[in-house]
Amino acid sequence: AAKNDLKAYVMNYNNPGSGNTPKIPMSDADYNSLYQSVQLQFFPGEKMIYLTTAFSNTYNYFTSAQAKRLILLVSLESNRLQLAKLSYRSITDRNNFNILYDMFTSQASKNDLEAYVKAYKD
């Protein structure tokens, strides 16, 4: 399977519009660099800008665990909810996305995210 994944990736690398490009999560080195950059931001608004940009970039993909760890750098629950929704597009292991739900103390936030995920269309 890994060989086929690699072959598909290589074949689609120069043809991103094909729709078959595999979603490969960000490398550990790139992820750690991003995490440290966000962590160094003092103001919450700056963290939101960094994370919004990272999750909006169509070339960035994350595992659920990577996304959760990044989102936990933001303390306000409404911002976490916004980022969790934004990150869903870029998640490579959506079957594990449920690990993000425990970031929320409010059941309303959990319900809101669940409704978003159920209605999401690629």
Language-model regions, residue ranges each:
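General marker for long, soluble alpha-helical cores
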Residues: 1-122
